[in-house]
């Protein structure tokens, strides 16, 4: 008796569509997890440098390693670093920051303009570890959103934070930021950091997937604008893509994976991409890879001049 074979689903390039399969070997798992582990090392490393300097007096060449907080800090006692969004709020209150703070904001702004503004979100911000955990639990438990909210809402929150800074005379977002609260709790043992973290975790877990980082956080919105023309991008290799959709399942900002736009640009061009690298490690076809914008060439558009001339001849 002849058995009827199931037809193999193919992508637009004619290749069979393959699902991502987690390798069984430890080495294979580490290849999938290597960017995640590197991100965690950076996030925890930054917190450890703050903590070690405050609690244990860490020094390098007689200078404190990293003092201050995630809004304004000093590296090795002489390199100022400042959150440009926090500085912008301070300026809007009518105060003029110190020259060192302005320089620190310029350094950070330049760094994220090169690497991608939302690299901050995926590689430095401690809240990312909390929201990643809630996203993982949602996938495991099959939890659905309670309601929908436009991802552009964060830009509205961004504008409101700036307006409130003008009207109240204080840096509005810095007072309620769960990022600042968590940092103060971890490093100095004061504030409502764990309460803020719990609120973000429960909101993301039960109410809205990536609710805080992907829909509400004005700092993420600010850095998305900064990163629009970043040099570091994720290259998109159109001929190898089978449209399997595995990347969109794990991406915290799936709207950036517009395959038509990516094919036209040869890369994920949206400033909302966090450059977390999840799509890179999950792609069965190695379609997505980090690259520099200058080395990414958009696919050549077909020359329709001759065909148009034939039609009008």
Features from the language model and the residues they span:
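Non-ligating segments of multi-cofactor redox enzymes
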Residues: 1-266, 271-274, 281-313
């Amino acid at each position: 008796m002849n058995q009827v074979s199931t037809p193999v689903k193919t992508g637009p390039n004619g290749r069979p569509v393959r699902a991502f399969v987690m390798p069984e070997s430890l080495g294979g798992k580490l290849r999938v997890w290597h960017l995640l582990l590197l991100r965690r090392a950076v996030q925890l490393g930054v917190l450890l440098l703050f903590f070690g300097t405050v609690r244990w007096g860490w020094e390098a060449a007689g200078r404190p390693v990293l003092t201050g907080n995630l809004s304004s800090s000093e590296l090795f006692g002489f390199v100022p670093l400042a959150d440009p969004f926090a500085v912008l709020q301070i300026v809007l209150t009518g105060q003029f920051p110190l020259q060192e703070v302005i320089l620190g904001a310029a350094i950070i702004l330049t760094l994220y303009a090169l690497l991608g503004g939302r690299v901050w979100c995926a590689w430095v911000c401690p809240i990312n570890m909390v929201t990643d955990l809630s996203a993982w639990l949602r996938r495991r438990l099959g939890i659905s959103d309670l309601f929908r909210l436009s991802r552009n809402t964060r830009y509205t929150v961004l504008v409101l934070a700036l307006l409130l800074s003008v009207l109240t005379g204080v840096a509005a977002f810095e007072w309620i930021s769960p990022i600042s609260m968590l940092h103060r709790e971890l490093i100095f043992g004061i504030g409502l950091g764990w309460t803020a973290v719990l609120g973000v975790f429960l909101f993301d877990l039960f109410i809205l997937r990536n609710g805080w980082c992907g829909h509400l956080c004005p700092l993420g919105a600010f850095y998305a604008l900064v990163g629009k023309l970043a040099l570091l991008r994720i290259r998109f290799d159109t001929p190898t893509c089978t449209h399997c959709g595995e990347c969109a399942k794990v991406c915290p900002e799936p709207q950036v994976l517009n395959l038509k736009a990516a094919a036209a640009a040869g890369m994920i061009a949206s400033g909302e991409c966090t450059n977390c690298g999840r799509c890179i490690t999950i792609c069965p076809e190695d379609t997505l890879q980090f690259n520099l914008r200058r080395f990414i060439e958009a696919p050549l558009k077909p020359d329709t001049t001759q065909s148009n001339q034939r039609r009008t001849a």
